[in-house]
Amino acid sequence: MKKNKIISEVICILMILALLCGCQDSKKYPTEGKESPSQTEEQVLWPSYEQANVLSDGSLALVDLTHKDDGYICARLLQEVTGIKLQIQKDDKKYNYDLKTTDFSTFPVNMENGTYTIKILQQIEGTRYAICASTSMEVNLTNDLAPYLYPNQIVDYTIDSYVYKKSFELVKEDRDDLTRIAHLFKYVVDTLDYDDQKAKDVSETFVLPDIDGSLKSHKGICFDYAASLAALCRIQGIPAKVIVGWTDIEYHAWVEIYLKDKGWINPKIYFKKEKWNLVDPTFSDSKNSDYEGKYDEVYHY
């Protein structure tokens, strides 16, 4: 059958990348998936905005902290204004996000349990920002995987998104998560071509991924590839991280995926004929498809 041929091509042989994982004999990777029920549309997780616990400066922005223990917080502008950021900090790790709209956007609470500091920042000049409002919050996640199961500002989709409908279409006959991941990965690689012009245009600025736009135009950069694959997986109830960091070649984005009963695949994987490798749909679809160098993680989304 065509389906079996596809799966045999992408998961037929197991290979551990000892250089990256440092535990050649202790880590075994799955060669076939354990049967699991299909995700239903009713099971897809969506953020909500009760505003039972908020941070606000009263005029520029509002942050809804209600669902911090579910792995996310939400924020929006209170007026049309530029230069406003949300900062999420734990210990010495900081995530800074631009607030762009008066509609709520979702942001992951993904630095494990503990004390977080949340700030609303306003640009003064250049990279100088003033603190408009600040609070601390204690986080005790109900599910360690939760931050990677919801849409957020980076992995952005709704029930009306093209990627949402496509995710269910691609896996409707699959019986296990490993097969689902294989089909979702193959779709991203087969659908998207690397957009060199966009890469040049955004080389000096941060641009959010455009998942639906990329899938419909069949073009994107690494951020679009990674966010698209993560969205496809999350919609199916498969936790997936978009990771941004350094490779030997460039500053880059890739994906890490969670498998039930196996945990986070480490080293991160992508499906490639006759081996496990990093889940890097951009490199798999480019002249760097054989890249096996370093991946230094900086941010998880």
Segments (PLM) and residue ranges:
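A short, highly charged nucleic-acid-interacting micro-segment common to nuclease
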Residues: 217-223
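Secondary-structure boundary elements
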Residues: 153-217, 265, 273-287, 295-301
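Aromatic side chains
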Residues: 116, 129, 148, 185-187, ...
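N-terminal accessory/pre-domain segments preceding catalytic cores
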Residues: 2-176, 264-265, 297-301
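Hydrophobic/aromatic-rich core segments of domains that either
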Residues: 224-301
